[in-house]
A protein has these predicted regions:
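Class I S-adenosyl-L-methionine-dependent methyltransferase catalytic core
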Residues: 1-185
């Protein structure tokens, strides 16, 4: 699906939302205000905001058996996707040593943003560049890495190109984040 069709699918899926996504220089740009809906069905600190995955999947549909969730703490187990998280027995900085390379077409990542966040999770801060290399190894050529973070991680332009940048905020007193979507070259 080309990028404009992804945008159109998003706007058709959410017709009441403002049309805040657009295409510029072969890159989806936009802003999402998620709102103050606190019905996320988990007590886990830092879980995806309510509606986040529905919005993402309107742009990049779940690919059964070809989707990986990194830092997947609150997601239920499913036969449709695999998970890497400190509570699954896979380490985010070494998982490509176990998972076969060129396996996934879609990877969604929501890493801890800071040392303070890691204190809440009970884990250590990750090295984003190492996790990126691990994701590169298991992602198929042409596959997509959707990275939700407060920073743009270091990446190699010979390995990835950015195809989307979407700012995201929940509501007042919440951090701004950015959804950066990479395509593996």
């Amino acid at each position: 699906m080309d990028l404009q069709k992804r945008i159109d699918n998003y706007h058709n899926t959410f017709p009441k939302f403002p049309k805040t996504l657009y295409l510029s220089d072969e890159c989806i740009l936009g802003m999402w205000v998620m709102g103050n809906n606190y019905t996320t069905k988990t007590d886990l600190y830092g879980a995806y905001p309510y509606g986040y995955l529905k919005r993402i999947h309107a742009l990049f549909p779940l690919i059964p058996n070809k989707t990986l969730h990194l830092f997947s703490g609150s997601l239920p187990d499913s036969e449709d996707y695999d998970k890497v998280d400190f509570n699954t027995g896979f380490d985010a900085e070494t998982f490509s040593e176990i998972i076969p390379h060129n396996t996934y077409e879609l990877i969604l990542a929501d890493p801890p943003y800071s040392i303070e966040d890691c204190d809440h999770y009970g884990c250590c801060m990750i090295k984003r560049n190492i996790v990126f290399k691990q994701a590169y190894n298991v992602l198929k050529s042409g596959g997509h890495l959707i990275w939700l973070d407060q920073v743009l991680p270091n990446y190699k332009k010979i390995e990835f190109k950015i195809i989307a940048r979407i700012g995201m905020v929940k509501s007042t007193n919440h951090r701004f984040r950015v959804i950066t979507i990479f395509e593996k070259n």
